[in-house]
């Protein structure tokens, strides 16, 4: 409001009462220089503001003064039940719809409604809509029975004009059949300037002309040669505006040429050409020199006047096939068709009518362009028959589409002709949705319950998902509707009537402004409101006390026959009547009527004090106090002496019996002790301490004590809390070797407890012996105590996976997991708890072999202990189980938790567990169920194993034996369990034997001496590779092997199997020869039983690398399936450790004939080439004969391995690297032996010939690093004549 000088009282109005909504805003501006006009105050009767003088102009309130129950509405008073109906606007005078001052929606005969009564209503009997006699039209906000004459009727409303797609017909708006009629004027020619004026036209008064200029554009020139408007180019698709055109009163002139102007489908709905005006040749259809290929005038039915001229259209087909007389109404005009495309060319290009068209021709290709159909017609399409889904046969030649509510076929056009309904079936009719009085039950409309109002969702007489939308009256139970009633039906017993607020929200919103029956209080049987006072409770369910209903009478009341609670006598504690002699118990004293105080049925009176008749108060502990004629002392004095005498006699008897029993027990125990002492003295076992054997096997591990001068310390490797770790060399006293070691030195000045823990670590390390556990070599007991262990050149596994992340594949990762699990399983078997397992405490010996170390926190459990409880000290929180952190309890299962974290570190390539979480917060996270996330490369199979390791219940975690088996199984198919990009191209960093030797040399470079460099494993477990002397028998092999140490692993970490019969392990090759010689000489064992022949040798193989005895005499250890089958790595169990057991031995052995071949494989099970032969020496048959003798090659020494002379070159004999070649023959078998076993008798070979002499003359410097399985100097195989092949192929 702006600058209203004469306006009074406007500032007194409360505008919040009037305007509503978020955009409501009141603004008052007064900019005059003179002060505002002084107005008279409002009348004293006004609450706040007024619109003028007098009480009649006071502002009335119906919003700001309402109760909260009337929220979002108005009211006629401040009380909760004085809310206006929701259909009211601006206030009301009562709660009904007829009490509104104004209506929010519609006003219908004095009542405010949501909408006007509909003009149609549903008849459930006929399943159809019928006119509603009470229907009204909406005229503005008023419901009227008839619309004013100047307005139209549309969908129950009075409108000024029809909406789109409807037309006025007899005062009503009806849907148009297709486009709604629109008449437009014709033009001289169509161009880009006027094309849009034809939009939605159905009739053109005049003609249509389309020329070349229509598409190419042109400059308009007036008759006085002045220039008009320039019209741009137009694409033929702009002619789509003519798709609604049905009639042209003049002619249709087409002379346009454009590459995209192929047909006249833009006029596809054109039905009539009037021909009121004609063009050249008196034509009403004139098509000359166009680029048309077909017409596309599929709806053209009549040309009333004029001829038809189709001329000079070089691409036009179909014109000759059309029966033009059927279209022309006038017979006076001819049809001119000339110089169009040759009909034979059209046929050649397939531009002919569809087979469903009749002989009258067509407008273009397809069944929709026929003038008439050969069989049936459906709309504009010609069909073979009317059997397709969704159509039916209307007459002999016509098919029609089923009603849109039909799902599939039908027999007629209406909704009751459908065989199946698309949405729902209401009686015989298909409907898009069920009417309001019915619900959809699996496609069938069924009637709602009779009490439902506004529709339903199911048959139940209730408001809910399977019942009514609303009802006139509902029965409530705990604020939830449980049934509906008719509007005039009364509430059942136990319920009371209540009115629901019109602004109700929640489950009662469908019942707003309606009546409900609420359940009475549980104590009331009939009521008028909620409560259990007689004001609202008409009848009690159980008992009534005073003015209230009760579930039961109180303790000091009793119920009469009418269930009324009546008070007991004042001295009673519970009663069954009102008198003093009807009490269950008394508050003070009883007075027995018949003096029988012990009977339960004895009657008594209750009294506050004893009466003069019964003056004495008796307090009996077994009963209530009562009044008596006699005093209590007389009764007690009579009984007291007898009671005391009985107690004394019983106590004396008990003491005598107890003393006798103790005496005899002591005598027997003394006699038994003397008997034991005498027996021990007689047997010589007199000892003061009794024996308590545990059955535990003795620990026979050896602890080697060395001197300080045997140690050579080098650079420092790491720091610890109690000492430092140095790399160094150990030179054992009296031996000519140097061993690279790691030396852990205790700090000076450490306490006695630290030294004890240092020795405890030494004890545990010396007690373990496993290929995946770092073993103690020796202890130096100087002032600074030293622990000597094997040197792990590649550092810890944590740094290794971080450094070589891009080179580590899935197989290596799973092998490491398996090895760690096997090492921990060994500790579990020996009752050792590690307590500090982590990736930093796993050392890498080779890329294929890891070892667990750092036993500083490890504890050995006694035979009767299942757990260790730490007293204090630091703990690696993020690696520990929850019970370790909270209770300091350590078991093997807590090591399993740490194993899961260690595996997580490895599979995340050195990730930090709980990296951004302080250690003190880790226990809380674990209790809440949080665990380390799944590594990116890890499948759910591996992650589930980690989750099992992190179970809060320790007993639910797997054992290390189970973990080792699981990871061993996964390592045989690594790509299935770890998804690493480029996995098959990854190779671990090379760490060959030469690298290790070089490391040892560098380490000992400062300590030069004559000692030989030896690895710790070789020093502890040496192996012999001495050649076999001639004539040596099986019984002569019992001597000890020489001291020359041999590295028992291939450079890639694969060990040499101890029972291999190939020269790749010289010791076992010698043993095979000895077995064969002994068996051949004695004739005890067939050469076809290599598994059994090994049992006759007396040579005991030394332990394999890492401490396991390798080799087996059983056939199962040699083969994984058929012994005559070439073994594939998938058929065998693939080893994943750094030592060879039976599995590894089996999976590397191939079989040719009866001979096992131990072939060197790399980490991916590919055959490794031997480094023995020089690159310029062929390994195949010399067909040219210009190869040089191998004896001329210089003999080489490589890494300390023996070197044998190369193969002899004998004239006519050629070295051959294919062992099967000499086995194929057609002149009978050479010998029952396979390759690798000499054809002549072994004794002859060993005693004379080239073999024996060469063996005696060889030195260790001449021995080779690797030998092939067809070493000639051992077998003299080249001296055997080559036989022709038995078959024309080579068997592999």
UniProtKB/Swiss-Prot annotation:
SUPFAM superfamilies: Growth factor receptor domain (SSF57184), L domain-like (SSF52058), Protein kinase-like (PK-like) (SSF56112). It comes from Apis mellifera (Honeybee). GO terms for molecular function: ATP binding; transmembrane receptor protein tyrosine kinase activity. The modification Phosphothreonine is found at residue 675. It is a single-pass type I membrane protein. The keyword Cell division does not apply. Residues 1258-1292 have a biased composition (Basic and acidic residues). It holds the Pfam family Recep_L_domain. ATP binds at residues 717-725, 744. Residues 1-641 are extracellular. The active site is at 836 (proton acceptor). The keyword Transferase applies. Disruption phenotype: Reduced adult size and ovary size, and prolonged developmental time. Belongs to the protein kinase superfamily. Tyr protein kinase family. EGF receptor subfamily. It is found in: Membrane. One of its GO terms (cellular component) is receptor complex. The chain crosses the membrane at residues 642-662. Residues 663-1292 are cytoplasmic. InterPro entries: Furin-like_Cys-rich_dom (IPR006211), Furin_repeat (IPR006212), GF_recep_IV (IPR032778), Growth_fac_rcpt_cys_sf (IPR009030), Kinase-like_dom_sf (IPR011009), Prot_kinase_dom (IPR000719), Protein_kinase_ATP_BS (IPR017441), Rcpt_L-dom (IPR000494). This is Epidermal growth factor receptor. The modification Phosphotyrosine is found at residue 1166. It is an enzyme of class 2 (transferase).
């Amino acid at each position: 409001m702006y600058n209203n000088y004469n306006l009074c009282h406007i500032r007194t109005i409360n505008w919040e009462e009037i305007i509503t909504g978020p955009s409501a805003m009141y603004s008052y501006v007064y900019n005059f220089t003179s002060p505002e006009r002084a107005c008279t105050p409002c009348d004293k009767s006004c609450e706040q503001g007024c619109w003028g003088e007098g009480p009649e102009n006071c502002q009335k309130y119906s919003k700001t003064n309402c109760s909260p129950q009337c929220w979002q509405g108005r009211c006629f008073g401040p009380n909760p039940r004085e809310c206006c109906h929701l259909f009211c606007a601006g206030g009301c005078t009562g709660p009904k719809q007829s009490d509104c001052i104004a209506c929010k929606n519609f006003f219908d005969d004095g009542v405010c409604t949501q909408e006007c009564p509909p003009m149609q209503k549903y008849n459930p009997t006929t399943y159809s809509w019928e006119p509603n006699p009470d229907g009204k039209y909406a005229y503005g906000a008023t419901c009227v029975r008839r619309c004013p004459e100047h307005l139209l009727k549309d969908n129950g409303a009075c409108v000024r004009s029809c909406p789109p797609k409807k037309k006025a017909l007899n005062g009503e708006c009806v849907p148009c059949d297709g486009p709604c009629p629109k008449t437009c004027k014709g033009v001289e020619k169509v161009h880009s300037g006027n094309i849009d004026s034809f939009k939605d036209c159905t009739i053109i008064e005049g003609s249509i002309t389309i020329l070349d200029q229509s598409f190419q554009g042109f400059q308009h020139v007036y008759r006085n040669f002045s220039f008009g408007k320039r019209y741009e180019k137009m694409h033929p698709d702009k002619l789509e505006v003519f798709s609604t055109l049905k009639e042209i009163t003049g002619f249709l002139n087409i002379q346009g040429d454009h590459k995209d102007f192929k047909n006249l489908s833009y006029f596809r709905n054109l039905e009539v050409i009037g021909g009121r005006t004609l063009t050249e040749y008196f034509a009403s259809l004139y098509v000359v020199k166009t680029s048309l290929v077909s017409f596309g005038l599929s709806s053209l039915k009549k040309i009333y006047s004029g001829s038809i001229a189709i001329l000079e259209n070089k691409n036009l087909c179909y014109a000759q096939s059309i029966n033009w007389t059927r279209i022309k109404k006038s017979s006076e005009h001819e049809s001119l068709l000339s110089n169009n495309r040759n009909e034979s060319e059209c046929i050649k290009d397939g531009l002919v009518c569809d087979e469903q068209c009749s002989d009258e021709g067509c407008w273009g290709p397809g069944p929709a362009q026929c003038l008439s159909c050969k069989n049936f017609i459906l709309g504009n399409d010609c069909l073979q028959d009317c059997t397709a889904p969704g159509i039916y046969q209307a007459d002999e030649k016509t098919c029609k589409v089923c009603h849109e509510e039909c799902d599939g076929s039908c027999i007629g056009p209406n909704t009751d002709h459908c065989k199946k309904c698309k949405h729902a079936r209401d009686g015989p009719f298909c409907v898009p949705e069920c009417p309001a009085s019915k619900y959809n039950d699996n496609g069938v409309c069924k009637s709602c319950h009779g009490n439902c109002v506004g529709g339903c969702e199911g048959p139940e007489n209730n408001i809910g998902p399977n019942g009514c939308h609303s009802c006139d009256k509902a029965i409530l139970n705990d604020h939830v509707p449980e049934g509906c009633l008719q509007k005039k039906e009364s509430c059942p017993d136990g319920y009371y009537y209540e009115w629901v607020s019109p602004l109700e929200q929640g489950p009662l919103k469908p019942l707003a402004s309606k009546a409900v029956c609420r359940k009475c209080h549980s104590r009331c049987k009939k009521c008028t409101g909620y409560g259990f006072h007689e004001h609202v409770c008409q009848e009690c369910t159980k008992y009534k006390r005073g003015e209230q209903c009760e579930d039961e009478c109180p303790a000091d009341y009793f119920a009469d026959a009418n269930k009324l609670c009546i008070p007991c006598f004042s001295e009673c504690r519970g009663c069954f009547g009102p008198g003093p002699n009807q009490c269950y118990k008394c508050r003070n004293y009883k007075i027995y009527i018949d003096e029988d105080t012990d009977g339960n049925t004895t009657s008594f009176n209750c009294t506050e004090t004893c009466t003069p008749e019964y003056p004495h108060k008796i307090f009996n502990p077994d009963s209530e106090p009562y009044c008596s004629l006699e005093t209590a002392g007389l009764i007690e004095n009579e009984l007291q002496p007898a009671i005391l005498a009985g107690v004394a006699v019983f106590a004396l008897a008990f003491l005598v019996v107890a003393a006798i029993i103790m005496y005899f027990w002591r005598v027997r125990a003394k006699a038994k002790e003397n008997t034991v002492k005498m027996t021990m003295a007689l047997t010589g076992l007199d000892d003061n301490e009794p024996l308590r054997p545990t059955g535990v096997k003795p620990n026979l591990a050896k602890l080697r004590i060395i001197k300080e001068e045997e140690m050579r310390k080098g650079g420092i490797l790491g720091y610890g809390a109690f000492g430092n770790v140095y790399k160094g060399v150990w030179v054992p006293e009296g031996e000519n070797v140097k061993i690279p070691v790691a030396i852990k030195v205790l700090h000076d000045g450490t306490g006695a407890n630290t030294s004890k823990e240092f020795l405890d670590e030494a004890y545990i390390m010396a007690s373990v012996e496993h290929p995946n556990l770092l073993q103690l070599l020796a202890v130096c007991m100087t002032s600074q105590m030293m622990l000597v262990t094997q040197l792990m050149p590649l550092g810890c596994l944590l740094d290794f996976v971080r450094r070589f992340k891009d080179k580590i594949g899935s197989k290596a990762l799973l092998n490491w997991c398996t090895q760690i699990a096997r090492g921990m399983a060994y500790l579990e078997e020996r009752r050792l708890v590690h307590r500090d397992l982590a990736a930093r405490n796993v050392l890498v010996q080779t890329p294929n072999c890891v070892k667990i170390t750092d036993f500083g926190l490890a504890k050995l459990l006694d035979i009767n202990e299942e757990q260790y409880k730490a007293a204090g000290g630091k703990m690696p929180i993020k690696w520990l189980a929850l019970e370790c952190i909270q209770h300091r309890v350590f078991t093997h299962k807590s090591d399993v938790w740490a194993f899961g974290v260690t595996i997580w570190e490895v599979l995340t390539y050195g990730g930090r567990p709980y990296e951004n979480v302080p250690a003190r917060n880790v226990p809380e996270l674990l209790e809440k169920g949080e665990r380390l996330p799944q590594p990116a490369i890890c499948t759910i199979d591996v992650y589930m194993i980690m989750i099992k390791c992190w179970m809060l219940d320790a007993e639910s975690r797997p054992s290390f034996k189970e973990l080792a088996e699981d990871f061993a199984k996964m390592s045989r198919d690594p790509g299935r369990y770890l998804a690493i990009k480029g996995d098959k191209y990854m190779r671990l960093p090379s760490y060959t034997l030469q690298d290790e030797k070089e490391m040892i040399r560098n380490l000992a470079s400062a300590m030069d001496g004559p000692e030989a460099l030896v690895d710790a494993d070789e020093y502890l477990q040496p192996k012999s590779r001495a050649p076999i002397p001639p004539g040596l028998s099986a019984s002569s092999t019992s001597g000890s092997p020489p001291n020359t140490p041999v590295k028992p692993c291939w450079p890639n970490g694969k060990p040499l199997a101890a029972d291999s019969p190939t020269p790749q392990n010289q010791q076992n090759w010698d043993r095979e020869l000895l077995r064969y010689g002994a068996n051949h000489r004695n004739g005890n064992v067939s050469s076809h039983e290599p598994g059994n022949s090994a049992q006759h040798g007396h040579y005991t193989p030394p332990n394999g690398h890492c401490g396991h005895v390798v080799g087996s005499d059983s056939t199962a250890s040699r083969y994984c399936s058929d012994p005559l089958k070439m073994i594939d790595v998938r058929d065998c169990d693939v080893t994943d450790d750094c030592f060879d057991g039976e599995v590894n031995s089996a999976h590397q052995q191939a079989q040719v004939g009866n001979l096992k071949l131990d072939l060197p494989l790399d980490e991916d099970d590919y055959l490794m080439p031997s480094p023995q032969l020089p690159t310029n020496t062929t390994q195949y048959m010399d067909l040219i004969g210009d190869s040089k003798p191998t004896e001329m090659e210089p003999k080489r020494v490589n890494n300390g391995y023996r070197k044998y002379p190369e193969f002899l070159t004998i004239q006519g004999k050629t070295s051959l690297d294919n062992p099967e070649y000499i086995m194929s023959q057609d002149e009978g078998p050479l010998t029952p032996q396979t390759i690798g076993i000499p054809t002549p008798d072994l004794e002859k070979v060993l005693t004379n010939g080239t073999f024996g002499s060469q063996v005696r003359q060889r030195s260790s410097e001449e021995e080779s690093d690797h030998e092939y399985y067809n070493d000639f100097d051992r077998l003299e195989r080249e001296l055997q004549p080559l036989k022709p092949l038995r078959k024309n192929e080579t068997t592999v």
